[in-house]
Structures are given as structure tokens and as C-alpha cells.
Design a protein with these regions (language model features):
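All-alpha amphipathic helical-bundle segments outside canonical DNA-binding/catalytic cores
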Residues: 132-148, 168-169
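A hydrophobic/aromatic-rich effector-binding and dimerization subdomain
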Residues: 2-10, 70-130, 154-160
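N-terminal positioning helix adjacent to the helix-turn-helix/winged-helix DNA-binding module
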Residues: 170-178
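Generic protein-terminus/edge-of-domain signal
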Residues: 1-57, 73
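Conserved metal-binding segment of the jelly-roll/cupin
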Residues: 54-66
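Hydrophobic/aromatic-rich alpha-helical bundle segments in the mid-to-C-terminal region
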Residues: 161-165
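Conserved small/polar residues in nucleotide/adenosyl-binding loops
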Residues: 184-185
Length: 186
């Protein structure tokens, strides 16, 4: 399964099970990424640190991360998009490109999904794949909405897994703002 959509303003979104084989996607340093192991295992190097991911583990990565797939034993999904497609300033700070999933921690957001959580995200992926078959002037906005739904659902799962309440929210917000300022001035 391979889906790509490009907007007239250089917005890009893609979903693939073959990221490691796609030189164009690997070369594109503007992409935010969700890497989700659907079966088997995946060894992926992020910023020169090898991570061993197993079934239903998911990570979120920014364009600043250097990513190299080392070993694939099974199937994994990579969901990618750039800031021209989604990251406009109007998005809520928690589900934006400067939000919780990408800049909410000093570590890479890595979660083990339960079967129910995996099904939640899979249903969104199925809707996304179905939308690629509909070629009309509403497709771009629908893909953006589906991406936002994926991000919101994943954010809720992460907040629950990490037990983020009001007391921890300030710490995450400070980290998020630090990354936003750093990214702006680099």
C-alpha cells in the first residue's frame, strides 16, 4: 500500500509500508513521521541510536530526526507529512507540529499500543486509504482532517499512557515551547 498526495503549495502527505525502499521519501528532510510496527519487528536508527520496535509500537519523529531503517522483519506503516500540508499556526498547540507528540518530551514519543488502541488507529488509516480513491476538489481538505483525527487520537492515547494531567502539563508545555523557539531560530 502506497499513497501520496501533493498540494499546489508543496504540501505533501504519504502513507507507505515501504519507507525503507523509497529513496525520494527518505531524502525529503521536511517530513514529520509516524512509524508504526503492525507485525513482526523493526530496527530503526534515529539520530544514530538504534531502536528495536515490536508489533503495535509507534513512534513520532520530526524533520530534525535523522532516520535509517536497519532491519525489517514483518510489516510497518510510515505516515508522513510536511508543514506545508498540515502545520499551520491555526492548529491547536497540542495537536500541531509543535505539539505534544513531536515536541512534548525531550525523548522520542514511543508507545506500545493495546489491541483496542491499535484498532482505533487502524480504522483511521482505513478511512485515509479510502479517501485516496476519491478524486475531487475536497480530497485535500479531507486528507488534512483525517490526519488531524489520527494526531488527536494518538495524542489522547499518549496522554493516557503517560498519565499526563494538569500537574505534568506545565512541564510538557515548557519543553514544547523550547523546541518551538529552537526550531524557529535554527
Amino acid at each position: 500500500m502506497e499513497y501520496r498526495f501533493n498540494t499546489p503549495l508543496n504540501g505533501n502527505i504519504a502513507m507507505t509500508y515501504h519507507y525503507h525502499e523509497d529513496a525520494a521519501l527518505r531524502r525529503d528532510k521536511s517530513l514529520y513521521k509516524f512509524v508504526w510496527v503492525q507485525s513482526g519487528t523493526l530496527d530503526i536508527e534515529v539520530d544514530h541510536v538504534v531502536m528495536h520496535l515490536e508489533k503495535d509500537e509507534i513512534i513520532s519523529l520530526t524533520p530534525l530526526h535523522h532516520v535509517e531503517v536497519k532491519r525489517v522483519e514483518g510489516e510497518y506503516l510510515t505516515f508522513l507529512f510536511n508543514s506545508n500540508f498540515y502545520c499551520i499556526y491555526g492548529h491547536d498547540k497540542e495537536v500541531s507540529c509543535n505539539g505534544f507528540l513531536f515536541h512534548g518530551s525531550s525523548h522520542i514519543m514511543r508507545l506500545q499500543l493495546s489491541a483496542a488502541q491499535s484498532e482505533q488507529l487502524k480504522s483511521i488509516i482505513d478511512i485515509f486509504a479510502g479517501e485516496f480513491g476519491i478524486k475531487d476538489n475536497l480530497q485535500e481538505e479531507m486528507l488534512r482532517i483525517i490526519l488531524k483525527r489520527f494526531i488527536i487520537t494518538y495524542t489522547r492515547i499518549a496522554r493516557e499512557k503517560l498519565d499526563v494531567g494538569q500537574d505534568k502539563e506545565k512541564s510538557f508545555d515548557i519543553i514544547r515551547r523550547y523546541y518551538a523557539v529552537s526550531y524557529t531560530h535554527l
